[in-house]
Amino acid sequence: MAIANNKKAFHDFFIEDRIEAGLVLEGWEVKAIRAARVQLKESYIYWKKDAFYLVGCHITALPTASTHIKPDAVRPRKLLLNQSEINKLIGKTERAGYTIVPLDLHFSRGKIKMEIGLAKGKKQHDKRQSMKEADWKREKQRLIKHTR
């Protein structure tokens, strides 16, 4: 079950590979995510020293959050990945010109996980072509529906 999707990632990138990663979250963040108060639209993932971090993900604190904790809505959040996955991602991003984007946030056995994608950027004409294909697909469905 998806909590939040990053539709902009599918519009701006060709997704080559998908990997599920854990997140290091604080208690108030988990409560806010369960209440679907999260936005992935402008977020991205980068490598720093020894781990990957999610930046730009906006998690809005609930009004009932603790008074002694000052919630930071856009703080960098560490991703939890296996060493083999880390090596694969580093190799692809450094050599082949790929980037890593968050695709969605979902529950897996009660834990909050993030699906990240190894992606290559789309050019403007690729975006136009994707939009034409989506429009044609919608039009086909409309025609099929009306001919029945």
From Swiss-Prot:
A GO biological process of this protein is:
trans-translation
Offer one Pfam family short name for this entry.
SmpB
Which SUPFAM superfamilies did the record assign? Small protein B (SmpB)
> Where is this protein localized, as stated in its record?
Cytoplasm
Keyword terms, alphabetized: Cytoplasm, RNA-binding
GO cellular component terms given for this protein: cytosol
Q: Where is the composition biased (Basic and acidic residues)?
A: 127-142
Q: Name the segments for region: Disordered.
A: 119-148
Q: What does the record give under GO molecular function?
A: RNA binding
* Primary localization class, coarse: cytoplasm
Query: Cross-referenced InterPro entries, in alphabetical order?
Result: SmpB, SsrA-bd_prot, SsrA-bd_prot_CS
Function noted in UniProt: Required for rescue of stalled ribosomes mediated by trans-translation. Binds to transfer-messenger RNA (tmRNA), required for stable association of tmRNA with ribosomes. tmRNA and SmpB together mimic tRNA shape, replacing the anticodon stem-loop with SmpB. tmRNA is encoded by the ssrA gene; the 2 termini fold to resemble tRNA(Ala) and it encodes a 'tag peptide', a short internal open reading frame. During trans-translation Ala-aminoacylated tmRNA acts like a tRNA, entering the A-site of stalled ribosomes, displacing the stalled mRNA.
**Family from the record:** Belongs to the SmpB family.
Q: What PANTHER family does the database record attribute to this sequence?
A: SSRA-BINDING PROTEIN, TMRNA-BINDING COMPONENT OF TRANS-TRANSLATION TAGGING COMPLEX
- Which named protein is this? SsrA-binding protein
Q: From what organism does this protein derive?
A: Neisseria meningitidis serogroup B (strain ATCC BAA-335 / MC58)
Q: Which gene encodes it?
A: smpB
